[in-house]
Regions:
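C-terminal cap of thioredoxin/glutaredoxin-like
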Residues: 3-13, 23-31, 37, 69-78, ...
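Short linear clamp-binding motif
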Residues: 19
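Nucleic-acid-interacting cores, centered on viral/eukaryotic replication and modification enzymes
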Residues: 43, 59, 87
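Local sequence-structure signature of Cys/Sec-based thiol-disulfide redox active-site neighborhoods
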Residues: 47-77, 91-92, 254-274
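Short, contiguous strand/loop micro-motifs
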Residues: 62-63, 100-101, 179-180, 265
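Structural alpha/beta surface segment adjacent to cysteine/selenocysteine redox centers
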Residues: 63, 69-162, 274
């Protein structure tokens, strides 16, 4: 069966030696351990304070990505709740080796977002297909014309019109908010994508703060807790904006009638955790 898969080589090899497995495990455990994380965070905070810089959170928005639309709905509340400068970037989709079946990924992002939105108190129109590219272009030109503060205010409205397929509403938003030219749009996308690459990531719906990445609304509670620990929570003691949903196993038990299919990626650290 191994011949069906392409050997990636390097750290992504699918058949490391026992010694390499052991070494990799030790290295990853050391890098990701609580002590190492705390040390890195303390260093980042010390550098921030010494430079006199505010708490700067960068957000990377991929217009036709469902997860980005969910994230856009919390930008306003997030920027108001925490004492931060929220800088918003427009980006292109994953490229190169990071772009595995991009059309399927986009379609599944809409499917996933529709099914999880309610659990976070958010909205996502049911959408069986990727949004129309004409509307994606229009939505992109609207957002490219906004600075970060304007982006925070309007991104969710633009996204809702896009994912609802409401061209008339998008046109109205374009008239009221303005649109970037094609040249300006490309420049904005190039700039945001380059910044994301500089910070060593490839995806949309990403938040970056203090040398760490936080993906979408379902990981935002990690960033909220970190900011609160640094005294940046303007409503200390209040519930988080995006707390981790409780897992309710329910009373039903397996009776042997259901089959769970798992599709692991042997390159993925998530597979190792599972």
């Amino acid at each position: 069966m191994a011949e069906q898969f392409q050997e990636q080589g390097g750290v992504a090899t699918m058949d490391p030696s026992p010694l390499m497995r052991w070494l990799s495990s030790r290295v990853v455990k050391r890098i990701c351990g609580d002590a190492s994380v705390s040390k890195r965070r303390a260093k980042a905070e010390s550098q921030r304070v010494s430079s006199g810089q505010a708490h700067v959170v960068e957000y990377f928005h991929y217009v036709e990505d469902g997860y980005s639309h969910l994230a856009s709905q919390v930008l306003q509340a997030f920027s108001e709740r925490y004492d931060i400068d929220l800088v918003c970037h427009l980006v292109r989709g994953p490229q190169g080796d990071n772009s595995a079946e991009p059309e399927l990924l986009l379609r599944l992002s809409g499917y996933d977002s529709f099914h999880v939105a309610a659990d976070y108190g958010l909205n996502f129109p049911q959408h069986e297909h990727a949004p129309d590219q004409r509307l994606v272009k229009l939505a992109s030109t609207i957002l490219a014309a906004q600075d970060s503060s304007q982006f925070i205010e309007c991104a969710a409205h633009v996204g809702d019109a896009l994912w609802s397929g409401d061209e008339a509403r998008l046109q109205a938003l374009a008239e009221s908010l303005g649109c970037a030219s094609d040249t300006e749009l490309e420049k904005r996308l190039d700039s945001g994508t380059a910044r994301r690459s500089e910070l060593k990531h490839y995806s949309g719906a990403m938040f970056y703060y203090g040398r760490e990445w936080y993906w979408g609304v379902d990981r935002l509670y990690h960033l909220e807790k970190r900011l609160a620990e640094l005294g940046a929570d303007r409503q200390a003691g209040e519930p988080l904006l995006m707390p981790r949903p409780k897992v309710e196993p329910g009373e039903l038990k397996d009776n042997g009638s259901l089959t769970l299919e798992v599709y692991p990626s042997l390159r993925s650290p998530y597979t190792a955790i599972c």
